[in-house]
Design a protein with these regions (language model features):
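Short hydrophobic alpha-helices at membrane interfaces in multi-pass membrane enzymes
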Residues: 164-188, 217-224
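Perimembrane helix-loop-helix junctions
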Residues: 199-224
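Specific aromatic-rich, kink-prone transmembrane helix
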Residues: 152-171, 203-204, 210
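Start-transfer (signal-anchor) and selected internal transmembrane alpha helices
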Residues: 1-26
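Active-site neighborhood of glycoside hydrolase catalytic domains
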Residues: 181, 189-197, 201
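Membrane-interfacial loop-to-transmembrane alpha-helix junctions, especially the N-terminal start
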Residues: 9-13, 122-128, 175-179, 219-223
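Active-site lumenal/periplasmic loops and adjacent helix-entry segments of GT-C-fold
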Residues: 23-119, 124-157, 188, 195
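Membrane-interfacial segments
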Residues: 119-124, 169-173, 200, 213-214
Length: 224
């Protein structure tokens, strides 16, 4: 029995690794650098690095910047500290950008699988759902085609909000209190993309209305 569980765990790991490697293929070529938005993202990293090197902790870019992006109003900048700090160690700018995309895609695979596995209680279904989510054309286009990194980050963290809904509707208890999980999910989306946050909030409101008996009655509040 234990050996069967180990073999299932190993097969799940390799399936997820295959999903990650397949979706990350553009990172091993110059395809991920062909988007018209990539220069904007590279200059964004370099600009934040210059500010930090000068001792200025500026988290948001000017709203009316030279690339005409409302970055400060639409995308968070907290997670950009990872490539910025790597850049400050002397790593090449393009390598830092690729590493950032690798981290985003890995987080997407892990969080989507965790949410689907708890929701369906079936590892095979969770693996298939993870592949569909991580290989979705709109997600790959945001990550590689349009280089909309804030949006891609939002889609990476959206499963955390879905995990809250899965546990709240099913009245399941996890290691974290439900209110804390919801707060973490909203905070992650706030620091990623305001557009994806709006999608998440609409989904949250819809579920609160549709599953109002499970979520809003006494037992539902106690679950939170």
């Amino acid at each position: 029995m234990i050996e069967k569980m180990k073999s299932k765990g190993n097969s799940t790991f390799w399936c997820l690794a295959g999903i990650f490697l397949t979706g990350a293929l553009p990172l091993f070529t110059n395809y991920c650098l062909n988007s018209a938005e990539v220069p904007y993202q590279l200059v964004r990293i370099e600009n934040m690095k210059d500010y930090l090197s000068a001792g200025i902790f500026q988290m948001a870019m000017p709203v009316n910047w030279q690339y005409e992006h409302g970055t400060a109003g639409l995308d968070g900048n907290l997670f950009w500290l990872l490539p910025v700090l790597l850049r400050m160690t002397g790593a090449a700018l393009e390598s830092v950008y690729r590493m950032f995309l690798i981290c985003i895609y890995a987080v997407t695979v892990c969080f989507s699988y965790k949410t689907l596995e708890e929701g369906f209680q079936n590892k095979k279904t969770a693996v298939i759902g993870t592949a569909l989510y991580c290989w979705a054309p709109w997600y790959l286009d945001a990550l590689y085609g349009r280089a909309a990194i804030g949006e891609a980050l939002g889609y990476a963290f959206l499963p955390v909000l879905l995990l809250f809904l899965v546990r709240a509707v099913g009245r399941k208890k996890g290691k974290l209190p439900q209110w804390l999980l919801l707060a973490i999910a909203i905070s992650l989306l706030l620091q990623s993309s305001f557009a994806v946050l709006e999608v998440g909030m609409l989904l949250l409101v819809f579920c609160c209305v549709y599953y109002r008996r499970q979520l809003l009655e006494k037992d539902g509040w106690l679950t939170l």
